[in-house]
Curated annotation (Swiss-Prot):
EC number: 7.-.-.-
Keyword Transmembrane helix: yes
Record-stated family: Belongs to the NqrB/RnfD family.
NCBIfam families the UniProt entry points to: PRK00816.1, rnfD
One of the record's GO cellular component terms: plasma membrane
Membrane-topology annotation of the record: Multi-pass membrane protein
Organism: Shigella flexneri
Keywords: Cell inner membrane, Cell membrane, Electron transport, Flavoprotein, FMN, Membrane, Phosphoprotein, Translocase, Transmembrane, Transmembrane helix, Transport
Cofactor: FMN
Function per UniProt: Part of a membrane-bound complex that couples electron transfer with translocation of ions across the membrane. Required to maintain the reduced state of SoxR.
Name of the gene this protein is made from: rsxD
Name of the protein in its database record: Ion-translocating oxidoreductase complex subunit D
Length: 352
């Protein structure tokens, strides 16, 4: 008699996967609400577009592969991919961008490798990076938070800008991006990088309206705190483990603090790194993807620390203002190596 030994995992629980994905979707509610509050209805429109695109793309591939469409869609992984991409792009980006990015993420970055559990890279971040490299202007055209914005688009205006590029009154993105100082606004990280390169002092930069927040950038600090709240809830629900978020945030904070102490005139303070951009979204919702992250506890600590270091390096010295997506994908590359050297010793065998 021949016994076939399959590779781990030895149990496959569709309900467990679906439940975890659902918990992550629920935990995203505070972050989504904060982005709606500070950046308007465009975020909701992008989420709807991405969700529909993700489900249709996944259903199409499953149909072509002659696999069960209904059973696979119920695991909610396609919805989560669409959601993570949608909240990562500017709220008034053209409709075709989120559709293109989502379809690429689901078909190329996920299903091409065999579907959920087989993809080596985070699909949402693959989609994001493809869009960022292909359409850098549109992908960096964030609106100023409502508290410093001159023109705040309503729901109808948001839909019209996303689908036609103009509001009902004829305004365009350049008009909507104006802040209270009459200057076209960018994100806190983008503003800091651009201003330092232009020769402005940190003292001057901190006077810009975008930094009018209590701790970091206006609006962005509350968005990050909202994602943090959702992440803490995920930890409480035991949907994710603490190793990756903690090591990521501690490493990012440590690098930012040391850099700021050594070069306060050219490098951002730690609170700007921690509460701007996609820091908390990345820490709790992206890096913790169980498929593309390390699978051992020591490996998770190393994986998170590496991502934190990469985010700081890209933000401080790279060509892109945020860097979370690139850091995630670069860290994904190292996962097989990390897992190999941190795998637990087999019982009864010596080390080495």
């Amino acid at each position: 008699m021949v016994f076939r030994i399959a590779s781990s995992p030895y149990t496959h629980n569709q309900r467990q996967t679906s439940r975890i994905m659902l918990l992550v979707l629920l935990a995203a509610v505070p972050g989504i609400a904060a982005q709606l509050r500070f950046f308007g209805w465009g975020t909701l429109v992008q989420i709807l577009l991405a969700s529909v695109s993700a489900l249709l793309a996944e259903a199409l591939v499953l149909k072509l592969r002659k696999q069960s469409v209904a059973a696979t869609l119920k695991d909610n992984s396609a919805l989560l991919t669409g959601l993570l991409l949608a909240v990562s792009i500017p709220p008034l980006a053209p409709w075709w961008m989120v559709v293109l990015g989502t379809v690429f993420a689901v078909i190329i970055a996920k299903q091409l490798y065999g579907g959920l559990g087989q993809n080596p890279f985070n699909p949402a971040m693959i989609g994001y990076v493809v869009l960022l490299i292909s359409f850098p202007v549109q992908m960096t055209s964030w609106l100023p938070p409502h508290e410093i914005a001159v023109n705040i688009p309503g729901f109808i205006d948001a839909i019209q800008v996303i689908f036609s590029g103009h509001t009902a009154s004829g305004g365009d993105m350049n008009t909507l991006r104006l802040g209270i100082d009459g200057i076209s606004q960018a994100t806190p990280l983008d503003t800091f990088k651009t201003s330092v390169r232009a020769g402005h002092s940190v003292e001057q930069i901190m006077q810009y309206p975008i930094y009018s927040g209590i701790l970091a950038g206006a609006g962005w600090q509350w968005v990050n705190l909202a994602w943090l709240a959702g992440g803490v809830w995920l930890l409480w629900q035991k949907a994710i483990r603490w190793h990756i978020p903690l090591s990521f945030l501690v490493t990012l904070a440590l690098c930012a603090t040391l850099g700021w102490l050594f070069s306060p005139e050219t490098l951002a303070a730690p609170q700007i790194h921690l509460l701007s951009g996609a820091t908390m979204l990345g820490a709790f919702f992206i890096l913790t993807d169980p498929v593309t992250a390390s699978t051992t506890n020591r490996g998770r600590l190393m994986f998170g620390a590496l991502a934190g270091l990469l985010v700081w390096l890209i933000r401080s010295f790279g060509g892109y203002p945020d860097g979370v997506a690139f850091a995630v994908l670069l860290a994904n590359i190292t996962v097989p190596l990390i897992d190999y050297y941190t795998r637990p010793r087999v019982y009864g065998h010596r080390k080495g």
